[in-house]
UniProtKB/Swiss-Prot annotation:
This is NADH-quinone oxidoreductase subunit C/D. It holds the Pfam family Complex1_30kDa. It is a peripheral membrane protein. It comes from Klebsiella pneumoniae subsp. pneumoniae (strain ATCC 700721 / MGH 78578). It catalyses: a quinone + NADH + 5 H(+)(in) = a quinol + NAD(+) + 4 H(+)(out). NDH-1 shuttles electrons from NADH, via FMN and iron-sulfur (Fe-S) centers, to quinones in the respiratory chain. The immediate electron acceptor for the enzyme in this species is believed to be ubiquinone. Couples the redox reaction to proton translocation (for every two electrons transferred, four hydrogen ions are translocated across the cytoplasmic membrane), and thus conserves the redox energy in a proton gradient. Signal peptide: none annotated.
Length: 602
């Protein structure tokens, strides 16, 4: 097991919502020693990480410097943009019509840094970051598509979420957010022919060769409608016989504009949309969003709220892992475990429905708390589940996961090292299978996870299909361990914080104070007004690290909602891990990733 967690210094113990510039972070001193004390603008935020504005001409040099430090920043966690043109609260920041941010992580330091570059509307060009971090490829494609920012030197700067004939850049502020703002859609014969022509497969457009001097390659479309694609997902395979010479994932079929929706919903009314980004995760998806909003608001929730949130999150983690393990076994060729798993998942849904009133998409977490208190009898239902589930896990292992055929199909298949995982932004079980025990619940505890006793399972140095699935089984056991502690140690107290921005606010006082009634009316009708600032929250979601990066301009709605999902990064890694393997190995690999396309496409 690798444990590189550094002890958090005293200044890290400040409230999560405190606005800080992080000038005392060692990396700021290292950057100033190398590039000069006046080379950067350091932005105070509530993100919890240093935010440094760099000049475009210095971007690659700064990125290379950070990657080669003694304790390097080895992972490009996220990269995206923002339309700054309508933003009013920008005091002290470089003039910008648009900006692009680069979020880097250092495993050795257990610290992050966010680089930002300011751009003017008449010169939207940046050098590509792909030479430093290969996973910048898809992030730059999406940023170009959404904002029109060109990354010079990018190997294949083409649309990634939208159809190839799409016009405009959807995340610009002057781009319509609702269908009613567009002209009526008409599909003429000429337009239909144009659309069909645009969908014609041309290997050169995907960076693929038609063949060698002596033979042509065969091209095969796996998906977008294929049972092993786990959603509307297409992979173009370049084959030499059954060997995969190269492949290109084609995503975007599930894209529904989740980040654009964040700009048109109030801080409160956006919560149901978070459930649908990774639709198996339920309340897990709500956690990073409400925590990020609470940082903006300066809310500290009661202990009871923290434990309730952890309990619901771990129930949904078990629910998601059960589906993953059983469908992985099904992809390899065994059917029975799927039916076993759905029996177990039904028990979880019954428990979740009893607590929240809903099954898959509860939309139950609230800014400052949860929707309502735990119902009578919740402890009995949870206790019965905890008595049932451990024996079922043992049966999964005995019946399927120790099977020699399954192991023969998955051991050593689609294997990658820790270095490769970090280069591609891999998180979750895929990264931990390489031996790095990076679990946000342990390394950067949130919602009181530091008060729970549990282990982080890791692999032995190489992440392959079998190791990934076995880690998930052990993670199930650890989640059961956490749930037992929730059952035994549920605190008493309120289920909402006593704070003016808690939403919806407590209604009891509205019958006594006219000021409270006015506040309640405004928050329920328009939504709460969050202070102008930026906040960020990452969590250990069911499939890896999920995060929300929110920008408030002092309004009832988010100015910019950036959703970073683990599945997006994991699918980009597919070609590097599967080249030289067989098509049958690809099916096993896809089953071992643990993804749903809504988590990829948002």
């Amino acid at each position: 097991m690798v444990n590189n967690m550094t002890d958090l210094t005293a200044h890290d113990a400040a409230p999560a919502w405190q606005t800080r510039d992080h000038l005392d972070d060692p990396v700021i001193g290292e950057l100033r020693n190398r590039f000069g004390p006046d080379a950067f603008t350091v932005q105070p935020t509530r993100t919890g990480v240093p935010v440094v504005w760099v000049k475009r001409e210095q971007l690659l040099e700064v990125g290379d410097f950070l990657k080669k430090l003694p304790k390097p920043y080895v992972m490009l966690f996220d990269l995206h943009g923002m339309d700054e043109r309508l933003r009013t609260h920008r005091d002290g920041l470089p003039a910008a019509d648009f900006s692009v941010f680069y979020h880097l992580i250092s495993i050795d330091r257990n610290r992050d840094i966010m680089l930002k570059v300011a751009l003017s509307e008449n010169d939207l060009h940046l050098p590509t970051f792909t030479k430093l971090f290969p996973n910048a490829n898809w992030y730059e494609r999406e940023t170009w598509e959404m904002f029109g920012i060109t990354f010079d030197g990018h190997p294949n700067l083409r649309r990634i979420m939208m159809p190839p004939t799409w016009e405009g850049h959807p995340l610009r502020k002057d781009y319509p957010a609702r269908a009613t703002e567009f002209d009526p859609f008409e599909l003429t014969k000429a337009k239909q022919d144009l659309e069909m022509e645009a969908l014609t497969f041309k290997p050169e457009e995907w960076g693929m060769k038609r063949g060698t001097d002596n033979e042509d390659f065969m091209f095969l479309n796996l998906g977008p409608n294929h049972p092993s694609a786990h959603g509307a997902f297409r992979i173009i395979l370049q084959l030499d016989g059954e060997e995969i010479v190269d492949c290109v994932p084609d995503i975007g079929y599930h894209h529904r504009g989740a980040e654009k929706m964040g700009e048109r919903q109030s801080w409160h009314s956006y919560i149901p949309y978070t459930d649908r980004i990774e639709y198996l995760g339920g309340c897990v998806n709500e956690m990073p969003y409400v925590l990020a909003v609470e940082k903006l608001a300066g809310i500290t929730v009661p202990d009871r709220v923290n434990v309730i949130r952890v309990m619901l999150s771990e129930l949904f983690r078990i629910n998601s892992h059960l589906l993953y393990i059983s469908t992985f076994i099904q992809d390899v060729g065994a059917m029975t475990p799927v039916f076993f798993a759905f029996t177990d998942r039904q028990k979880i849904y019954d428990l979740v429905e009893a607590i929240t009133g809903f099954r898959m998409h509860p939309a139950w977490f609230r800014i400052g708390g949860v929707a309502h208190d735990l119902p009578r009898g919740w402890d009995r239902l949870l206790r019965e589940f905890l008595e049932w589930m451990p024996k079922r896990l043992d049966s999964y292992e005995k019946a399927a996961l120790r099977n020699t055929i399954l192991k023969g199909r998955s051991v050593g298949v689609a294997a990658y090292t820790a270095k490769e995982a970090l280069e591609w932004g891999t998180t979750g079980a895929g990264l931990r299978a390489t031996g790095i025990d990076f679990d946000v619940r342990k390394w950067r505890p949130y919602s009181g996870y530091e008060n729970f006793d549990f282990e982080v399972p890791t692999g032995g140095g190489v992440s392959d299909c079998y190791t990934r699935v076995m880690l998930k089984v052990e993670e199930l056991r650890q989640s059961l361990r956490i749930l037992q502690q929730c059952l035994d140690n549920m605190p008493e107290g309120p289920f909402k914080a006593d704070h003016p921005l808690t939403t919806p606010p407590p209604k009891e006082r509205t019958l006594q104070h006219i000021e409270t009634l006015i506040t309640h009316f405004l928050q329920v009708s328009w939504g709460p007004v969050m202070p102008a600032n930026e906040s960020f929250q990452m969590i250990e979601a069911t499939k890896g690290i999920n995060s929300y990066y929110l920008t408030s301009d002092g309004s009832t709605m988010s100015y910019r909602t950036r959703v970073r999902t683990p599945s997006f990064a994991h699918l980009q890694q597919i070609p590097s891990a599967i080249r030289g393997s067989l098509v049958s190995d690809l099916i096993v690999y896809l089953g071992s990733i643990d993804f749903v396309m809504s988590d990829v496409d948002r």
